[in-house]
Amino acid sequence: MENVVILGAGYAGMAAATQLAARTKGRDDVRVTLVNPQATFTERLRLHMTGTGQQVARFDIPELLAGTGARFVRGWVTAVDADAKTVRIDDERVLHYDTLVYALGTVADTVPGVDDHAYTLNSFQDAELLADRLTRLGSGTVVVAGTGLTGVESAAEIAEQHPGLDVVLLGRGEPGANMREKPRAYLQAALERLGVTVRAGAEIVKVLPDAVELAGGETMHADVVLWTSGTRAAPLAAAAGLATDERGRIVTDATLRSVTHPDVYAVGDAAAIKQGYGVMHGTCQGGMPAGVHAAVSIFRVLQGKQPKVFRFGYYHTPVSLGRGDAVVQFTHPDDRPRRLFLTGRPAVRYKETVTASPWPTYGRMKKLPASGAFWPRGGRFTRGVR
């Protein structure tokens, strides 16, 4: 019996689970187990909406897996022993594996005071805590730490849903820094229209009960701090003896296997996946293809074949600016911005289409195998991947 254990039911983990279940359905020599702390799927792309009190759909993981032969185990992964090939759940239960898919994602990379005095969007529960606090606040100052895409979307959403609050978007970089001049200007004008104050070139070094401390000693009052500034992987992988990078992500070979433990595949935000243009950054855009590829590779190995090289190229950066506005920067496969972009209602329609819930896609995946045609492979930008 080949035991395949998949850790994490995010975008990448769910893709791996549904694809592997589809390819091994009916086989009595393969057991697929998916482990996740919650029985519901979290759409991380919509947590900025949950964090402002908006209702988003919830999806039941065991219900989706019903009839596939895959089993679901609810619990927190507390330890992995890559040499013994075991996973400990809630410090009580131990699962043995022959092949492991590590898809546990990342958490906020914080500074002192964040754990005690700031909110994050690490989970649905975290977003609900933020929503409750914003509702009770009524008036005051909200500092959104981090000028990346999550910070921009969160600041816009908070300002639109809670017009009585003063929203400050603060970070080292300029919002929309990865965009060309026109879409970047549109994004910044939208934030200004919503009343968001932007402070670029500022770095928070500490979060206090009612303020943030900046590099250089300045203190800024804050009734609420939302931390979106950077991510890192949990220390589980490094503690397991797997090779990791400086952010705790598992270093993989070109087929998505750990460079130190080839029976471990790493996908999604928790993996440092190299392409011809560098290491992929964590997004749903690349997570689902990586999950599918891992499933296909595992199935190939079960057939006595070698796994194939994973190639992926980016194609867009969609950013919501509240419910009625958005900007989409189309990109080259290496994530450099193209000249093409969308703004306003066309951008809203485009973003809602491409970031629509993946749940129907997972439903199709558990019935029909997908392939590399499912995503752009990057052309000349990834041909050198070996």
Predicted regions and their residues:
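FAD-binding core/adjacent interface of flavoenzyme oxidoreductases
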Residues: 1-3, 69-141, 226
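C-terminal auxiliary extensions adjacent to catalytic cores
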Residues: 323-386
